[in-house]
Amino acid sequence: LTVPGALPLALRPLQERVLTLTVGLDGPPVIDAVAVLSFADGANWSIRIDGLRLNAWSLPPDWSEPLTETLAWLTDVQIAVAGTVTRTPLREAPHRSWEFAILADRRERRWVEHALFDWTARVWALPVFVDTRRLGAPLAAGAVEIPVDATGLDFAVGSLAMLWRDVATYELVEVAQIANARIALRAPTRRAWPVGTRLMPCRTARLTDAPELRRHTDRLMSTQLRFEATEPCDWPPALP
């Protein structure tokens, strides 16, 4: 928070001063904070600050090509002189990555080029495309829960989810609770969503390397992407 001068700041009656609040690109993906202005008469004025500090990858894979999800555990194996073996896990959760191809035409091609130019090295909100569900009923703006059975899907409390219509029409929401075939949200939805809207769990992830864009025509391009999760992805010891 930048103020025009040194604190404490004197204000005359009806005087206007501009305070500049800057949010950096580095830090937790979800911004949830309060700035409090304290006045000499004991009054306080609170400013709610919320939002997201990341972009979403909103273009689905090219489903004519395989999508590969990889889980990588790390275990230390020690063999004693007597021949006994001791295995010690070195990771609480496996490293998780996804690799898939995309095919983009016209508007989608422009979106891919701009998104990669602007955000390649930073953290993305990556949908887990294979766990997609569709809304069975309209979702009003300001909704605080989504009716969906999340059993066996990658929705997690504290993680993000995406409501999706197309590459430019989507909304990221934060999951607060999962129970009784409903997902409770930490903040209300900002717009209404019709029946058939896709709902996907998201994980924060980074591109492992800069993709090489292949142009097939002046409108059509393709590339291969590999993302690695930046958040812990707890995994059950057995398949659900």
Predicted regions and their residues:
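N-terminal intrinsically disordered, low-complexity, charge/repeat-rich segments that act as generic
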Residues: 40-108
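Solvent-exposed loop and beta-edge segments used for protein-protein assembly and interaction
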Residues: 13-17, 27-31, 90-96, 106, ...
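A structural signal for short, hydrophobic beta-strand segments that form beta-sheets
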Residues: 1-3, 60-63, 133-140, 172-175, ...
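Short solvent-exposed strand/turn elements
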Residues: 180-204, 222-233
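Autoprocessing Asn-cyclization modules and mimics
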Residues: 103, 107-191, 234-239
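Short, charged beta-turn/beta-strand-edge "cap" motif at the junction between a beta-strand
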Residues: 25-27, 165-171, 204-205
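Oligomerization/assembly interface segments of phage tail-like spikes and tubes
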Residues: 73, 87-106, 209-240
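Feature for long, exposed domains in two main contexts
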Residues: 1-55
